[in-house]
Amino acid sequence: MNVNNPNQMTVTPVYNGCDSGEGPQSVRGYFDAVAGENVKYDLTYLADTQGFTGVQCIYIDNAENDGAFEIDVEETGQRIKCPAGKQGYFPLLVPGRAKFVARHLGSGKKSVPLFFLNFTIAQGVW
């Protein structure tokens, strides 16, 4: 199993017109794996070291890929599925520690840009 290294992630301040506890922020996740391989994202390190808490939304850019992209919230069992050739914002149910498992269901090795957000954006897929 490929485990995403949180030491290679950084928190980026963003502005959306509202105030959360630490201010609106995003974390760029790097998904780069072969089809069916699970990649774990444990954002608790970022919560402990950089104050990134309360993940509420994820942006998934699966526009360039031939299969669906899935990401599961470990604590709640919620599964988000972004169809092949699509991208969008998806609300997340993360009541506590932000831990996720992602996979791509297409063929070959794929890269899928992800952004974890600590604020909400209305769901939209295009």
UniProtKB/Swiss-Prot annotation:
Signal peptide: none
The entry's keywords: Virion
A Pfam family reported for this protein in Swiss-Prot or TrEMBL: PRD1_P5_spike_N
Cellular localisation: Virion
InterPro entries hit by this protein: Phage_PRD1_P5_spike_N
Cellular component annotations (GO), alphabetically ordered: viral capsid
Top-level division of the source organism's lineage: Viruses
Functional summary from the UniProt entry: In association with P2 and trimeric P5, forms the spike complexes located at the 5-fold vertices of the capsid. Essential for viral infectivity.
Name of the protein: Penton protein P31
